[in-house]
Amino acid sequence: MSPSDIAYTAVLPDGWTRPRGFSHAVVAKGTKSVRIAGQIGREPGQSHIPPGTDAGTQWRVALSNVVTVLKAAGGEPQHLVALRAYVTDIAEFNAAGAAIGAAWGTTLGKHFPAMTLVQVSALIDPQAKVEIEGEAILP
């Protein structure tokens, strides 16, 4: 397959390590559609989430990572049309509501895209408590 046959352009934010086996986001060629891969609460440059990192902190970092990837694709938070969040413990997510709400306000303000939240048994990093993926339409 030649590069011209690929139906998307991969996105890598400045200063981020290229992931193995996936792209942080893709922009579909011929469209303004951006698909953002699941982002966990790991700071860019870290290899793992530090043990004991709480759900609110992980949510803030994961959501910030989604926005960083979106900006690298040429978008802004208000271009998000959908988010999907996977959490390992809904009760812990609910208990962290104030921290999550504050992170949302700081990161997305009053923008509320369509959203799904589901509990899963585990995520790629054993310390991960949340993974957020998104979709955006650029103007």
Spans of features found by a protein language model:
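N-terminal presequence-like segments and the immediate start of the first folded domain
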Residues: 1-81, 87-139
